[in-house]
A protein has these predicted regions:
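N-terminal helix-loop segment corresponding to the beta1-alpha1 unit
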Residues: 1-96
């Protein structure tokens, strides 16, 4: 039996805890969640302790089941990529 949100695409522009948790719950129910992050450093939640082998376990939990895409939206090519992704999504999450 399929999950309730299979076939739904979510673009996740959230950071830290509340937004990523909401997006993770959508992934838990079968949505395809694509997390958009800054290139080079990702989102600040990657620094939350506890750390294991240089990776934040908290970040891993908040972002379970997601795909990750590093995009520089200040770069015209990066912005164009995001503009092309937006119409393919049924849900867009942000918490800026």
């Amino acid at each position: 039996m399929g999950k309730a949100l299979e076939g739904i695409r979510v673009l996740d522009f959230t950071t830290m805890a509340a937004g990523p948790t909401a997006a993770a719950m959508l992934a838990d129910y079968g949505a395809e969640v694509i997390k958009i992050e800054r290139p080079g450093r990702g989102e600040d939640g990657r620094k939350f302790p506890p750390m294991v082998d240089g990776e934040s376990l908290t970040y891993c939990w908040f972002n379970r089941g997601k795909k990750s895409l590093a995009v520089d939206m200040k770069d015209p090519e990066g912005l164009e990529l995001v503009k092309k992704l937006i119409p393919t999504a049924q849900v867009i999450l942000e918490n800026f």
